[in-house]
Amino acid sequence: MAQAIIGAIAASAAGSALGAGIQAGAEAALQSQRYQQDLALQRNTFEHDKDMLSYQVQASNALLAKNLNTRYSMLIAGGLSSADASRAVAGAPVTRLIDWNGTRVAAPRSSATTLRSGGFMAVPMPVQPKSKTPQSSGFSNPAYDMSTVSSRTSSWVQSQNSLRSVSPFHRQALQTVWVTPPGSTSSSSVSSTPYGVFNTDRMPLFANLRR
């Protein structure tokens, strides 16, 4: 009887140990499988992100190259040389010319040039011709009539006589004694002319007048 009880206890313990071992082995196998799955998922995610980033970089480079080629073609069509077109596309300064109308971008191969520096040209308006009355020549013309000539002469003489009373200068314009030149180290200036007569604030000769 005792042997049977001991045998049952031993069998139960052995079964429990065997079940625990089997469970531990199964859990270890599941953990290893889960680890391999996570590692494969991480590897696939990294490869996917790398491929997508590569495609995005390629698409961005292709779009940039297309835009630069379009700008280059437009500059070439506008008359710029290939060197100036390349500089303009890269953002570098291009060749410029200076004439009486200002600074311009050199475009030697341009098909049309104007005298204006990028300004809008006024639309020419049609001029209505004025009808002129034909005048006869000689003394029969009213412009050469003796009375007209006499009145013109008298009016001119009167205008000249009236101008004689007008002074050619301001009454105090010639009363300046002396003015310190710009290169002088002296700061003294003497003048009997009020500052309101001349606008000397922006004249180089009077630069030291108010020092």
Curated annotation (Swiss-Prot):
It is found in: Virion; Host cytoplasm. It comes from the Viruses. The keyword Nucleus does not apply. One of its GO terms (cellular component) is viral capsid, decoration. Keywords: Capsid decoration protein, Capsid protein, Host cytoplasm, Virion. Its main location: virion. The N-terminus domain points away from the virion surface. Minor structural protein that forms a portal-like structure at a unique three-fold axis of symmetry, following binding to the host receptor. The channel formed by VP2 may allow the delivery of the viral genome through the host endosomal membrane. Homooligomer. The portal-like structure consists in 12 copies of VP2. Interacts with capsid protein VP1. Translated by a ribosomal termination-reinitiation process from the bicistronic mRNA coding for VP1 and VP2. Belongs to the norovirus VP2 family. This is Minor capsid protein VP2. It comes from Southampton virus (strain GI/Human/United Kingdom/Southampton/1991) (SHV).
